[in-house]
Amino acid sequence: QLDRLNKTSAVILVGGESDYVAEDSINETERAVALYLDNQEKLLWWYRNISRQDYFVQGWKKHKIYPDFLVAVMDKKDGKNYSKVHVVETKGLHLKNEDTDYKKDVFSLCNKYWTSKDWRDLQMEFGDKEIEFQVIFEDEWRSRINDIVSNN
């Protein structure tokens, strides 16, 4: 069944709009994060990434990393634009394993080297935006999202 994301359904929309994702494609942590993101006034937009279809990061292993969310916080200067995109992968505590360590390592390298390259040089659609990659665990997601929202 497809439906809008609310407190009783587990369906995702794009930043309060109407792109839908099937109920079984989201876990409880992702659902909680999505609901929380949707209530943040300082967010310009957020997007629930669709695994194996949308945005991905290619590390040194064969399989691509499809992060859970892309998030843009309003720029403090004008409140209309954004200067940074946050790439967020959420993980349950029971999923702290070798795969999670790999994703953290890939994201760490992305954070280290991304600032040295302008998106325009890569012909990417975000132009001159910064990008920050994060793996967030279920016991810290609220504080980490608050940090994202308040530190832009």
Predicted ranges, named:
Residues Q1-N152:
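Electrostatic, structured charged patches in enzyme active sites and in nucleic-acid/phosphate-binding
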